[in-house]
Amino acid sequence: MRPILVVVLLALALTGCGIEIVSGSATPASSPPTVGSAPDGASDVPVDSTIDAAPGADDSDTRAVDERSAVSITDQFWSGWFADQGLRYVAPTVEGGYTGTDGPSCAGEPSVPGNAYYCPAGNFLAWDEDLMRAGYTQIGDAWVYLVIAHEWGHAIQAQLPDRFVSRAVELQADCLAGAALQGAADQGLVRIEPGDDEEIAQTLQAVADDYRWTDESSHGNARQRTAAFQGGVRDGVEGCLRL
């Protein structure tokens, strides 16, 4: 089977944000994710090693590369984790970006603007590109990795026994995102630089009133979300399952 994404970055120079792809290629899961409506084979295109995704910039092509990379490394981490536990892993399909209300419906419910979501009924992920753009221009590519890893966390919750799924499902998904990104970093797939959690907290606070994905009433405030993310980085998946 061909790899989901051939990553040829030796360095992805980032100013003010710190998610950096460094090496490796993703191993396809049992149900490989695909990004949006990209042509067949599009995910096999090598990534430009000169891309600089600094805060304040928003090149949609560059952001799309980061989205594919985030999908790839997150899928690879969870595929390996489930294999290590002797469990079957079913990767979610990735429908990718939409605008406004033109995203895929979930169990008959339409998509809403400013959101990213996992649909259990269809086992897929989707996100509003306006949400991605908002965080991308303020923090850089770390935002893209956070959003995708968080929604993937919901896909993981759907595959876990109920006793391991916290009542605080959104904060647990933030924790699982931290565990997955740190796990990917430990495997040499991605680099998380000091200060990323503070930058993520600042961005969560900045857009908290503007987007459904950052609505404090359902997801927790920036401080709670950052603490959950840090918990995943520090304690790994097992720590998240104790929430």
Labelled PLM ranges:
Residues V7-L9, G18-V45:
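Short, low-complexity, disordered segments immediately C-terminal to signal peptides
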Residues V22-T27, Y98-A126:
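Catalytic zinc-binding patch centered on the HExxH motif and its immediate surroundings
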Residues G56, A70, Q85-C106, P194-E199:
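Acidic helix-start/capping segments at beta-turn-to-alpha-helix junctions
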Residues S79, A168-G183:
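An active-site-proximal "capping" alpha-helix that borders the catalytic cofactor pocket
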Residues E129-L146, P161-R167:
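Short pre-active-site segment immediately N-terminal to the catalytic Zn-binding motif
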Residues W152-R167, A180-A185:
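Catalytic Zn2+-binding segment of zinc metalloproteases
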Residues D186-L243:
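Long, well-structured alpha-helical subdomains associated
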